[in-house]
From Swiss-Prot:
Any single GO BP term: L-methionine salvage from methylthioadenosine
Family annotation (SUPFAM superfamilies): NagB/RpiA/CoA transferase-like
A UniProt-annotated Pfam family: IF-2B
This protein's encoding gene: drdI
Binding site for substrate: R49, G50, A51, R92, Q199, N250, K251
Function: Catalyzes the isomerization of 5-deoxy-alpha-D-ribose 1-phosphate to 5-deoxy-D-ribulose 1-phosphate, as part of a 5-deoxyribose salvage pathway that recycles this toxic radical SAM enzyme by-product to mainstream metabolites.
Catalysis performed (reactions): 5-deoxy-alpha-D-ribose 1-phosphate = 5-deoxy-D-ribulose 1-phosphate
Keywords of the record: Carbohydrate metabolism, Isomerase
Natural source organism: Clostridium botulinum (strain Kyoto / Type A2)
Entry annotation: catalytic residues: D240 (proton donor)
Name by which UniProt lists this protein: 5-deoxyribose 1-phosphate isomerase
First-tier enzyme category under EC: isomerase
HAMAP family for the chain: Deoxyribose1P_isomerase, Salvage_MtnA
Length: 349
């Protein structure tokens, strides 16, 4: 199978091309976008998912908004741009990369406010492409830092999908796996199924399997058993937002994995692009948690698995306490506790 990429940019046709992740692994189909409204829907409906990929997609979405924005003067242009930025930002509230990418695009427009509006539109196009390319570089650097914490023969547990399908390429949590494969290491990956949307089995297992990596899918409630059997040497997960104290929001179920890892003495590593670290959010209690629709739990595959009308609680994320985290691994380096002090130092470099 050809390499699976979540995001492609058609430079000649000025179109964003996204892999429809809602139908994986059964079908591989790409959808083209050229409007901010289409991009909003792609993020909201999880055609594209994963914090880094969402950020890149949103940047292109704001460029599409800029294309049709008023050109009579900068004030009207920027007012329209800000409105569309807020609109795109509302598509998924937990992933901080979304608002980060939109702010970068807004800042680029402001930096060039004295230029002709048509020229600013072209500048925003190039800025979205730069954010896309930068994400690839960041993911590879995270992998290079993470692999120093691993060794040949390692057993890894991962949760949800912080892989190539959640980023522009390589992934964050999976980046060291691809690099270890290149080195010829003999290692095993256990991929939590990740209820209720099954990103671990439909996405992570798919991309690792296609890459020839030894991957085994387990249900979420098997993680404790696998750890108790000595099969796991490290847990590596991604993140949607990290607070200034190290508390980490990631896909629902990650907190439980961290508790198990701590009990069994297994290191818990967070693979984190620096845009996912929100120093303006003090603790995990300040992170907004998206609640998703009940059908994801009661009738995910068109078959009812619960009584119709039953109450459903479906948070998309939980927050792993910083006390359960061994290290936060970024493209700039590895951050160890105390996170409150050391995350500050990371941004002072």
């Amino acid at each position: 199978m050809a390499e699976l990429l979540a995001i492609k940019w058609d430079d000649n046709r000025d179109k964003l091309i996204l892999l429809d992740q809602t139908i994986l692994p059964n079908k591989i189909e790409y959808i083209e976008y050229d409007t901010a409204e289409g991009v909003y829907d792609s993020i909201k409906d999880m055609i594209v998912r994963g914090a880094p990929a969402i950020g890149v997609t949103a940047a292109y979405g704001l460029y599409f908004a800029a294309k049709v924005a008023p050109e009579d003067n900068f004030e009207n242009f920027f007012k329209y741009l800000k409105e569309k930025s807020s609109y795109l930002d509302s598509s998924r509230p937990t992933a901080v990369n979304l608002s980060w990418a939109l702010k970068v695009m807004e800042s680029k427009a402001l930096e060039n406010k004295d230029k002709d509006v048509k020229e600013i539109k072209s500048i925003l196009r190039e800025e979205a492409k730069r954010i896309h390319e930068e994400d690839i570089e960041i993911c590879k650097a995270i992998g290079e830092n993470l692999i120093t914490l691993l060794k040949d023969g390692v057993g890894i547990l991962t949760h949800c999908n912080a892989g190539q399908l959640a980023t522009s390429k390589y992934g964050t949590a999976t980046s060291p796996m691809y690099l270890a494969k290149e080195k010829g290491w003999n290692f095993k990956v256990y991929s939590d199924e990740t209820r209720p949307r099954l990103q671990g089995s439909t996405l992570t297992a798919l991309e690792l399997y296609e890459a020839g990596i030894d991957v085994t899918t387990i249900t979420d409630n098997m993680a404790a058993m696998v750890m108790s059997q000595g099969k796991i040497d490290a847990v590596i997960v991604g993140c949607d937002r990290i607070a200034a104290n190290g508390d980490t929001a990631n896909k629902i179920g990650t907190m439980g994995v961290s508790i198990l890892a701590k009990y069994f003495g297994i290191p818990m590593y967070i693979a984190a692009p620096t845009p996912s670290i929100d120093m303006n959010t003090k603790t995990g209690k300040d992170i907004p948690i998206e609640e998703r629709n009940s059908e994801e739990i009661t009738s995910r595959f068109g078959v009812w698995t619960a009584p119709k009308g039953v109450k459903v609680y479906n948070p998309g994320f939980d927050v792993t306490p910083h006390e359960n985290i061994t290290a936060i691994v970024t493209e700039k380096g590895i951050v160890y506790p105390p996170f409150k002090e050391n995350l500050k130092k990371l941004f002072e470099k």
